[in-house]
Amino acid sequence: MQILSRCQGLMSEECGRTTALAAGRTRKGAGEEGLVSPEGAGDEDSCSSSAPLSPSSSPRSMASGSGCPPGKCVCNSCGLEIVDKYLLKVNDLCWHVRCLSCSVCRTSLGRHTSCYIKDKDIFCKLDYFRRYGTRCSRCGRHIHSTDWVRRAKGNVYHLACFACFSCKRQLSTGEEFALVEEKVLCRVHYDCMLDNLKREVENGNGISVEGALLTEQDVNHPKPAKRARTSFTADQLQVMQAQFAQDNNPDAQTLQKLAERTGLSRRVIQVWFQNCRARHKKHVSPNHSSSTPVTAVPPSRLSPPMLEEMAYSAYVPQDGTMLTALHSYMDAHSPTTLGLQPLLPHSMTQLPISHT
Protein backbone atom coordinates (compact mmCIF):
# COMPACT_ATOMS: atom_id res chain seq x y z
CA MET A 1 0.00 0.00 0.00
CA GLN A 2 1.42 3.34 -1.04
CA ILE A 3 1.24 6.06 1.60
CA LEU A 4 -0.08 9.39 0.43
CA SER A 5 2.19 11.09 -2.09
CA ARG A 6 1.98 14.19 -4.21
CA CYS A 7 1.38 14.32 -7.96
CA GLN A 8 4.13 15.46 -10.31
CA GLY A 9 3.96 15.97 -14.06
CA LEU A 10 6.76 14.48 -16.18
CA MET A 11 7.52 14.17 -19.86
CA SER A 12 7.65 10.65 -21.24
CA GLU A 13 10.98 9.07 -22.20
CA GLU A 14 10.47 6.26 -24.67
CA CYS A 15 13.86 5.00 -25.82
CA GLY A 16 16.46 6.62 -23.58
CA ARG A 17 17.61 3.28 -22.15
CA THR A 18 17.50 1.24 -25.36
CA THR A 19 19.93 1.02 -28.24
CA ALA A 20 18.43 2.49 -31.37
CA LEU A 21 20.88 3.28 -34.15
CA ALA A 22 20.35 4.59 -37.63
CA ALA A 23 21.32 2.35 -40.53
CA GLY A 24 24.36 3.79 -42.32
CA ARG A 25 24.77 3.47 -46.07
CA THR A 26 27.94 3.36 -48.13
CA ARG A 27 28.70 3.06 -51.80
CA LYS A 28 31.51 0.61 -52.46
CA GLY A 29 34.27 1.68 -54.81
CA ALA A 30 33.61 5.40 -54.43
CA GLY A 31 36.42 6.87 -52.35
CA GLU A 32 35.11 10.39 -52.57
CA GLU A 33 31.88 9.40 -50.73
CA GLY A 34 32.36 8.75 -47.04
CA LEU A 35 30.59 6.12 -44.94
CA VAL A 36 27.72 7.51 -42.95
CA SER A 37 28.05 6.52 -39.29
CA PRO A 38 25.18 6.97 -36.83
CA GLU A 39 25.37 9.04 -33.69
CA GLY A 40 24.37 7.84 -30.25
CA ALA A 41 20.68 7.51 -29.60
CA GLY A 42 19.10 10.30 -27.61
CA ASP A 43 15.85 10.46 -25.69
CA GLU A 44 13.68 10.84 -28.80
CA ASP A 45 12.27 7.79 -30.48
CA SER A 46 13.50 8.59 -34.01
CA CYS A 47 17.20 8.45 -33.07
CA SER A 48 18.06 8.93 -36.74
CA SER A 49 20.64 11.72 -36.71
CA SER A 50 23.81 10.98 -38.68
CA ALA A 51 26.96 12.87 -39.71
CA PRO A 52 29.13 12.23 -42.81
CA LEU A 53 32.82 11.43 -42.38
CA SER A 54 35.59 13.34 -44.04
CA PRO A 55 36.56 12.33 -47.62
CA SER A 56 39.95 11.05 -46.40
CA SER A 57 38.29 8.17 -44.58
CA SER A 58 37.89 5.29 -47.00
CA PRO A 59 35.02 2.80 -46.80
CA ARG A 60 37.39 -0.12 -46.51
CA SER A 61 39.19 1.31 -43.50
CA MET A 62 35.89 2.00 -41.84
CA ALA A 63 34.65 -1.52 -42.56
CA SER A 64 37.81 -3.10 -41.19
CA GLY A 65 37.53 -1.15 -37.97
CA SER A 66 33.88 -1.95 -37.50
CA GLY A 67 33.66 -5.73 -37.26
CA CYS A 68 34.05 -6.71 -40.93
CA PRO A 69 37.02 -8.94 -41.86
CA PRO A 70 39.92 -7.15 -43.60
CA GLY A 71 39.42 -7.00 -47.34
CA LYS A 72 35.74 -7.97 -47.42
CA CYS A 73 32.42 -7.25 -45.76
CA VAL A 74 30.22 -10.16 -44.67
CA CYS A 75 26.45 -9.80 -44.17
CA ASN A 76 25.46 -10.44 -40.58
CA SER A 77 22.20 -12.06 -41.70
CA CYS A 78 23.04 -14.43 -44.58
CA GLY A 79 26.81 -14.75 -43.96
CA LEU A 80 27.72 -13.96 -47.59
CA GLU A 81 30.19 -11.36 -48.70
CA ILE A 82 28.66 -8.05 -49.56
CA VAL A 83 29.58 -7.19 -53.14
CA ASP A 84 26.64 -4.87 -53.79
CA LYS A 85 27.00 -1.21 -54.58
CA TYR A 86 25.39 -0.29 -51.23
CA LEU A 87 25.45 -1.89 -47.81
CA LEU A 88 23.81 -1.18 -44.46
CA LYS A 89 25.61 -0.92 -41.16
CA VAL A 90 23.86 -1.26 -37.79
CA ASN A 91 25.63 -1.50 -34.43
CA ASP A 92 29.04 -2.08 -36.11
CA LEU A 93 27.63 -4.94 -38.20
CA CYS A 94 27.22 -4.99 -41.99
CA TRP A 95 24.11 -6.04 -43.86
CA HIS A 96 22.83 -6.45 -47.36
CA VAL A 97 20.17 -3.89 -48.11
CA ARG A 98 17.73 -6.73 -48.75
CA CYS A 99 18.73 -8.68 -45.59
CA LEU A 100 18.09 -6.03 -42.95
CA SER A 101 14.50 -6.63 -41.78
CA CYS A 102 12.41 -6.57 -38.63
CA SER A 103 12.71 -9.75 -36.59
CA VAL A 104 8.95 -9.71 -35.87
CA CYS A 105 7.08 -8.61 -39.00
CA ARG A 106 9.96 -9.28 -41.46
CA THR A 107 9.47 -5.89 -43.03
CA SER A 108 12.53 -4.74 -44.98
CA LEU A 109 14.25 -1.83 -43.28
CA GLY A 110 16.41 -0.87 -46.26
CA ARG A 111 14.35 2.22 -46.96
CA HIS A 112 13.76 3.15 -43.30
CA THR A 113 15.72 5.97 -41.74
CA SER A 114 15.98 4.24 -38.36
CA CYS A 115 15.59 0.91 -36.62
CA TYR A 116 15.81 -0.48 -33.09
CA ILE A 117 18.04 -3.21 -31.75
CA LYS A 118 17.68 -5.05 -28.44
CA ASP A 119 19.32 -8.33 -27.43
CA LYS A 120 20.78 -8.58 -30.96
CA ASP A 121 17.31 -8.50 -32.51
CA ILE A 122 16.35 -5.87 -35.06
CA PHE A 123 12.93 -4.22 -34.78
CA CYS A 124 10.97 -1.68 -36.71
CA LYS A 125 9.55 1.17 -34.69
CA LEU A 126 6.03 -0.25 -34.50
CA ASP A 127 7.03 -3.71 -33.25
CA TYR A 128 9.63 -2.32 -30.89
CA PHE A 129 7.09 -0.21 -29.02
CA ARG A 130 4.54 -3.03 -29.12
CA ARG A 131 6.96 -5.26 -27.26
CA TYR A 132 9.09 -2.91 -25.18
CA GLY A 133 7.26 0.41 -25.21
CA THR A 134 5.87 1.97 -22.03
CA ARG A 135 2.17 1.43 -21.42
CA CYS A 136 -0.23 3.35 -19.23
CA SER A 137 -0.99 1.42 -16.05
CA ARG A 138 -4.65 2.48 -16.23
CA CYS A 139 -5.76 2.19 -19.85
CA GLY A 140 -3.00 -0.07 -21.20
CA ARG A 141 -2.31 2.12 -24.23
CA HIS A 142 1.17 3.12 -25.36
CA ILE A 143 2.79 6.28 -24.04
CA HIS A 144 4.56 8.34 -26.66
CA SER A 145 7.49 10.67 -26.25
CA THR A 146 5.26 13.74 -26.56
CA ASP A 147 2.80 12.64 -23.85
CA TRP A 148 2.72 14.13 -20.39
CA VAL A 149 2.71 11.42 -17.77
CA ARG A 150 2.55 10.90 -14.02
CA ARG A 151 4.58 8.28 -12.20
CA ALA A 152 3.53 6.53 -9.00
CA LYS A 153 5.55 3.71 -7.46
CA GLY A 154 7.01 2.61 -10.79
CA ASN A 155 3.70 2.95 -12.64
CA VAL A 156 3.24 5.40 -15.48
CA TYR A 157 -0.11 7.04 -16.30
CA HIS A 158 -1.48 9.43 -18.85
CA LEU A 159 -2.58 12.69 -17.27
CA ALA A 160 -6.23 11.91 -17.99
CA CYS A 161 -5.86 8.37 -16.65
CA PHE A 162 -4.40 9.48 -13.33
CA ALA A 163 -7.79 9.74 -11.60
CA CYS A 164 -9.36 8.46 -8.39
CA PHE A 165 -10.71 4.92 -8.68
CA SER A 166 -13.82 5.76 -6.63
CA CYS A 167 -14.95 9.19 -7.82
CA LYS A 168 -13.18 9.22 -11.24
CA ARG A 169 -11.87 12.73 -10.58
CA GLN A 170 -8.60 13.60 -12.30
CA LEU A 171 -5.94 14.51 -9.76
CA SER A 172 -3.96 17.73 -10.06
CA THR A 173 -0.30 18.46 -9.52
CA GLY A 174 0.56 18.73 -5.82
CA GLU A 175 -2.59 16.90 -4.70
CA GLU A 176 -2.25 14.04 -2.24
CA PHE A 177 -3.08 10.55 -3.45
CA ALA A 178 -2.65 6.92 -2.42
CA LEU A 179 -1.87 3.83 -4.48
CA VAL A 180 -3.74 0.79 -3.14
CA GLU A 181 -3.40 -2.47 -5.08
CA GLU A 182 -2.50 -0.58 -8.27
CA LYS A 183 -5.53 1.70 -7.84
CA VAL A 184 -5.18 5.46 -7.40
CA LEU A 185 -7.28 7.04 -4.65
CA CYS A 186 -7.76 10.66 -3.69
CA ARG A 187 -7.33 11.67 -0.06
CA VAL A 188 -11.07 11.66 0.70
CA HIS A 189 -11.79 8.15 -0.57
CA TYR A 190 -8.55 6.82 0.85
CA ASP A 191 -9.79 7.88 4.30
CA CYS A 192 -13.20 6.33 3.53
CA MET A 193 -11.52 3.04 2.69
CA LEU A 194 -9.63 3.08 6.00
CA ASP A 195 -12.87 3.81 7.87
CA ASN A 196 -14.61 0.89 6.15
CA LEU A 197 -11.78 -1.46 7.04
CA LYS A 198 -11.75 -0.29 10.64
CA ARG A 199 -15.54 -0.63 10.97
CA GLU A 200 -15.58 -4.17 9.60
CA VAL A 201 -12.73 -5.22 11.87
CA GLU A 202 -14.56 -3.84 14.91
CA ASN A 203 -17.70 -5.75 13.90
CA GLY A 204 -15.69 -8.92 13.55
CA ASN A 205 -16.33 -9.23 9.81
CA GLY A 206 -13.57 -10.07 7.41
CA ILE A 207 -13.25 -7.75 4.42
CA SER A 208 -10.62 -7.27 1.75
CA VAL A 209 -9.18 -4.00 0.55
CA GLU A 210 -11.06 -4.49 -2.72
CA GLY A 211 -14.33 -4.73 -0.82
CA ALA A 212 -13.58 -1.61 1.20
CA LEU A 213 -13.07 0.51 -1.90
CA LEU A 214 -16.02 2.61 -2.97
CA THR A 215 -16.97 2.30 -6.63
CA GLU A 216 -18.37 5.09 -8.80
CA GLN A 217 -21.88 3.67 -8.39
CA ASP A 218 -21.55 3.70 -4.60
CA VAL A 219 -20.40 7.32 -4.68
CA ASN A 220 -23.18 8.55 -7.01
CA HIS A 221 -25.94 6.35 -5.57
CA PRO A 222 -25.20 5.61 -1.93
CA LYS A 223 -27.39 3.07 -0.21
CA PRO A 224 -30.04 4.73 1.98
CA ALA A 225 -29.62 4.22 5.68
CA LYS A 226 -32.16 1.97 7.35
CA ARG A 227 -34.81 3.95 9.22
CA ALA A 228 -35.01 3.18 12.91
CA ARG A 229 -38.46 1.99 13.97
CA THR A 230 -40.17 4.04 16.68
CA SER A 231 -41.46 2.22 19.73
CA PHE A 232 -44.05 3.71 22.10
CA THR A 233 -44.55 3.15 25.79
CA ALA A 234 -47.93 2.29 27.32
CA ASP A 235 -48.33 5.82 28.71
CA GLN A 236 -47.61 7.42 25.36
CA LEU A 237 -50.10 5.17 23.59
CA GLN A 238 -52.75 5.91 26.21
CA VAL A 239 -52.39 9.67 25.74
CA MET A 240 -52.51 9.49 21.94
CA GLN A 241 -55.41 7.03 21.87
CA ALA A 242 -57.43 9.25 24.20
CA GLN A 243 -56.84 12.20 21.89
CA PHE A 244 -57.73 10.10 18.84
CA ALA A 245 -61.08 9.20 20.44
CA GLN A 246 -61.85 12.93 20.77
CA ASP A 247 -60.30 14.21 17.54
CA ASN A 248 -58.66 11.93 14.98
CA ASN A 249 -57.14 14.85 13.07
CA PRO A 250 -55.60 17.26 15.60
CA ASP A 251 -54.28 20.65 14.63
CA ALA A 252 -50.76 21.95 15.10
CA GLN A 253 -51.36 23.27 18.62
CA THR A 254 -52.78 19.95 19.77
CA LEU A 255 -49.86 18.10 18.23
CA GLN A 256 -47.46 20.38 20.09
CA LYS A 257 -49.23 19.71 23.40
CA LEU A 258 -49.13 15.97 22.76
CA ALA A 259 -45.43 16.21 21.96
CA GLU A 260 -44.77 17.94 25.27
CA ARG A 261 -46.82 15.38 27.21
CA THR A 262 -45.36 12.28 25.56
CA GLY A 263 -41.81 13.45 24.90
CA LEU A 264 -42.12 12.53 21.22
CA SER A 265 -41.59 14.76 18.23
CA ARG A 266 -44.50 16.35 16.42
CA ARG A 267 -43.57 14.48 13.25
CA VAL A 268 -43.76 11.09 14.98
CA ILE A 269 -47.14 11.91 16.53
CA GLN A 270 -48.47 13.21 13.22
CA VAL A 271 -47.44 10.00 11.44
CA TRP A 272 -49.06 7.93 14.20
CA PHE A 273 -52.38 9.76 13.73
CA GLN A 274 -52.16 9.33 9.96
CA ASN A 275 -51.65 5.59 10.33
CA CYS A 276 -54.51 5.32 12.83
CA ARG A 277 -56.88 7.19 10.52
CA ALA A 278 -55.93 4.90 7.64
CA ARG A 279 -56.53 1.78 9.72
CA HIS A 280 -59.80 3.16 11.08
CA LYS A 281 -61.07 4.00 7.59
CA LYS A 282 -60.10 0.56 6.33
CA HIS A 283 -61.90 -1.39 9.07
CA VAL A 284 -65.06 0.73 9.35
CA SER A 285 -68.02 -0.85 7.48
CA PRO A 286 -69.10 1.10 4.37
CA ASN A 287 -72.82 0.68 5.32
CA HIS A 288 -72.30 2.37 8.67
CA SER A 289 -70.11 5.13 7.38
CA SER A 290 -72.32 6.07 4.45
CA SER A 291 -75.82 5.61 5.96
CA THR A 292 -77.74 8.79 6.72
CA PRO A 293 -81.26 8.94 8.16
CA VAL A 294 -84.07 9.94 5.81
CA THR A 295 -85.99 12.93 7.10
CA ALA A 296 -89.65 13.51 6.36
CA VAL A 297 -90.52 16.35 4.05
CA PRO A 298 -93.45 18.52 5.20
CA PRO A 299 -96.46 18.02 2.94
CA SER A 300 -96.87 21.76 2.50
CA ARG A 301 -93.55 21.87 0.68
CA LEU A 302 -94.36 19.02 -1.67
CA SER A 303 -95.22 20.27 -5.12
CA PRO A 304 -97.67 18.41 -7.39
CA PRO A 305 -94.92 17.09 -9.69
CA MET A 306 -93.21 15.53 -6.69
CA LEU A 307 -96.52 13.91 -5.69
CA GLU A 308 -96.84 12.47 -9.17
CA GLU A 309 -93.34 11.03 -8.93
CA MET A 310 -94.10 9.54 -5.55
CA ALA A 311 -97.36 8.00 -6.81
CA TYR A 312 -95.80 6.36 -9.86
CA SER A 313 -92.40 5.42 -8.50
CA ALA A 314 -90.72 2.39 -10.08
CA TYR A 315 -88.86 1.52 -6.88
CA VAL A 316 -88.80 -2.22 -6.16
CA PRO A 317 -87.68 -3.05 -2.60
CA GLN A 318 -86.25 -6.39 -1.62
CA ASP A 319 -89.11 -7.14 0.80
CA GLY A 320 -92.30 -8.21 -1.00
CA THR A 321 -94.54 -7.35 1.96
CA MET A 322 -93.46 -3.72 1.83
CA LEU A 323 -94.36 -3.55 -1.85
CA THR A 324 -97.82 -5.01 -1.15
CA ALA A 325 -98.44 -2.52 1.66
CA LEU A 326 -97.42 0.35 -0.59
CA HIS A 327 -99.81 -0.64 -3.38
CA SER A 328 -102.70 -1.09 -0.98
CA TYR A 329 -102.04 2.32 0.54
CA MET A 330 -101.85 4.01 -2.84
CA ASP A 331 -105.11 2.35 -3.92
CA ALA A 332 -106.92 3.57 -0.80
CA HIS A 333 -105.74 7.20 -1.10
CA SER A 334 -105.86 9.45 -4.09
CA PRO A 335 -102.96 11.91 -4.83
CA THR A 336 -105.12 14.83 -3.65
CA THR A 337 -105.97 13.15 -0.40
CA LEU A 338 -102.30 12.25 0.07
CA GLY A 339 -101.28 15.86 -0.29
CA LEU A 340 -103.77 16.95 2.43
CA GLN A 341 -102.48 14.57 5.06
CA PRO A 342 -100.97 16.54 7.96
CA LEU A 343 -98.13 14.10 8.51
CA LEU A 344 -96.95 10.97 6.76
CA PRO A 345 -97.04 7.82 8.84
CA HIS A 346 -93.78 6.94 10.53
CA SER A 347 -93.52 3.69 8.67
CA MET A 348 -93.77 5.52 5.34
CA THR A 349 -91.05 7.98 6.18
CA GLN A 350 -88.57 5.15 6.11
CA LEU A 351 -89.48 4.20 2.55
CA PRO A 352 -86.86 5.32 0.04
CA ILE A 353 -87.99 7.63 -2.73
CA SER A 354 -86.63 7.23 -6.24
CA HIS A 355 -87.14 9.38 -9.32
CA THR A 356 -87.69 8.05 -12.78
From Swiss-Prot:
Organism: Homo sapiens
Keyword Cell division listed: no
The organism's place on the tree of life at top rank: Eukaryota
UniProt feature, compositional bias: Low complexity: 47-63
BP-aspect Gene Ontology terms: forebrain neuron development; neuron differentiation; regulation of transcription by RNA polymerase II
Residues covered by region (Disordered): 23-63
LIM zinc-binding domain ranges (all copies): 73-133, 134-196
Principal localisation: nucleus
Any single GO CC term annotated in Swiss-Prot or TrEMBL for this entry: chromatin
DNA-binding region ranges: 225-284
Stored Pfam families: Homeodomain, LIM
Localization per Swiss-Prot or TrEMBL: Nucleus
Keyword set, alphabetical order: DNA-binding, Homeobox, LIM domain, Metal-binding, Nucleus, Repeat, Transcription, Transcription regulation, Zinc
The name this protein goes by in its record: LIM/homeobox protein Lhx8
Gene Ontology MF: a single term: sequence-specific double-stranded DNA binding
The protein's role, per its UniProt record: Transcription factor involved in differentiation of certain neurons and mesenchymal cells.
UniProt-listed SMART domains: HOX, LIM
